[in-house]
Structure formats: structure tokens, C-alpha cells
């Protein structure tokens, strides 16, 4: 690479980041003089950068004059972990989309509502036309039915009290007894209950205290081949379950 094509770097930003790195290596704190010595920066420059970093919350100054990592860094760390988790989950969804040639959905049941957090589709695998909000169509979608299966009967009853099931297509199931009492299978399928011409399959994602599901949608004409979808869908749901278990949290977009 010739000099003219090298990126323009801002030296003060590089110095500030180096200070953050060194402070992070000293859990008990480190003084400005030691920081200057460790980084090779002039002491006046070190003080100037430290004042700025403290003002912005990236460092904190202790009573004895030592500097420690500030709350802003903790926030960045949490955000980075959440973004990495979302990236890992999305990669799994992309692989599943390519494997099954179907649109992929990740959804949760949170605070009494169905929330679709992620959709991975493409021009050749378009998402279902959400002509009715998924929050009001849990009874008619594999996504919603799988999530509701993770609730108690009382919670399902409460859901349908707030969102009475309505006929969305001639194939929509609206009977409360069946929707509330009938146990859902481990893998849920809806056949044109939400949208004519479209079928959907959903598998539970295992995470404590939060119903989550991974689902696919595809043209109903492919129903005859759905048994080929079962193993990849379950495997992807298990991979996401393991990612969430390691992270210890769900990457909510709220």
C-alpha cells in the first residue's frame, strides 16, 4: 500500500484508547504518572486526555488519585456482547434460510404480547405479508401457537381475552377450547391459517422464563416436503438455545 492510500488516523483518539487499555489492565486503579510511563505519553498530554475521559464517563478518578474504568465502558461492553449475540443468532438464521429456502423468524412472548425480533428473508424467500399484526394473530400462526405453548392455561386464557381469535382465512382455528386446552406439539405447523398460500413451522427455543421460537414460512405447495425441514429447524433452534444459555440473556431490541 502506498502512503497516499493509507487511512488517516487521529493520534489523540489512538492515545486515549491506549490509556483506556492500560487502565483496564489495572483493576485496582493506576495513577496518571504510571499511565504516562506505561504509554510513553508526555505527562501533560496524559492529564489532558484523562480529564476528557473522566468528563465523558469512560474513566473515573478515585479519592487517592488513581484512575479506573468508568460506567460508559461497562455500557459499551454490554452493548458489544448483545450485538455479538445478535450477530451469532442471525448467522444461524441465514444458514437456515439458505438450507431450507424459506424465510426465517425469531420471536418471543414478552409482557403479554407476541414480539417478532428478527426476520431473515430474501427476494427468493420473501417473508409472509403481515397483513394482520402478529400480536393479534397468535391463534393463527405457528409463531404465536409455539409461544403460547410455553404459557400456562391461565396465561393463554388471558391472552385470548385481550386478543379474541378471529377468522383470518377459512382455515383459521378460533375455538377457545382447542386453543387453550389442547397441548401444542413440540413442532407447530399452521397451514394457511394466517395467509392463504402460506404455511409456517415453528420450534421452541429453550431459555428460562421467556417463551421464544424459531420459525419458517414457505409456500403451502411445499407442505409435502416439510419432513425435510424438521431436523434443520430443530437443530438451528438448539444452536440458538445454546447461544442464549452461554450469554445468559435474550438480545431484546427494546
What do the PLM-derived regions correspond to, one by one?
Residues 1-83, 241-242, 246:
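N-terminal helix-turn-helix
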Residues 9-13, 70, 82, 86, ...:
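Short, structured helix-loop boundary elements
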Residues 24, 148, 152, 234-245:
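Short amphipathic alpha-helical signal-transduction/dimerization elements
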Residues 59-60, 106-107, 205:
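A structural signal for short hydrophobic beta-strand segments in well-ordered beta-sheet cores
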Residues 68-161:
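Amphipathic alpha-helical effector-binding/dimerization core
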Residues 168-243:
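Extended hydrophobic
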Residues 249-254:
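Signal-transducing coiled-coil/dimerization helices and immediately adjacent hinge/linker segments
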Amino acid at each position: 500500500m502506498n502512503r497516499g492510500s493509507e487511512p488517516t488516523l487521529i493520534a489523540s483518539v489512538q492515545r486515549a484508547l491506549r490509556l483506556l487499555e492500560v487502565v483496564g489492565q489495572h483493576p485496582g486503579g493506576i495513577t496518571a504518572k504510571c499511565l504516562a510511563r506505561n504509554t510513553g505519553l508526555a505527562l501533560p498530554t496524559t492529564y489532558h486526555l484523562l480529564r476528557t475521559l473522566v468528563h465523558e464517563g469512560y474513566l473515573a478518578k478515585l479519592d487517592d488519585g488513581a484512575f479506573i474504568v468508568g460506567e460508559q465502558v461497562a455500557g459499551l461492553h454490554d452493548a458489544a456482547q448483545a450485538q455479538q449475540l445478535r450477530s451469532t443468532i442471525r448467522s444461524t438464521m441465514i444458514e437456515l434460510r439458505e438450507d431450507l429456502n424459506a424465510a426465517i423468524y425469531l420471536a418471543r412472548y414478552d409482557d403479554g404480547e407476541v414480539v417478532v425480533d428478527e426476520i431473515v428473508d430474501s427476494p427468493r424467500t420473501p417473508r409472509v405479508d403481515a397483513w394482520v399484526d402478529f400480536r393479534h394473530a397468535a391463534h393463527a400462526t405457528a409463531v404465536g401457537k409455539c409461544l403460547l405453548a410455553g404459557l400456562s392455561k391461565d396465561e393463554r386464557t388471558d391472552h385470548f381475552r385481550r386478543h379474541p381469535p378471529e377468522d383470518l382465512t377459512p382455515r383459521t382455528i378460533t375455538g377457545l377450547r382447542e386453543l387453550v386446552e389442547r397441548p401444542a406439539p413440540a413442532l407447530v405447523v399452521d397451514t394457511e391459517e394466517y395467509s392463504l398460500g402460506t404455511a409456517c413451522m415453528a420450534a421452541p427455543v429453550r431459555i428460562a422464563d421467556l417463551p421464544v421460537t424459531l420459525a419458517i414460512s414457505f409456500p403451502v405447495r411445499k407442505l409435502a416436503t416439510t419432513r425435510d425441514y424438521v431436523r434443520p429447524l430443530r437443530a438451528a433452534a438448539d444452536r440458538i438455545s445454546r447461544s442464549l444459555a452461554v450469554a445468559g440473556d435474550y438480545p431484546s431490541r427494546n
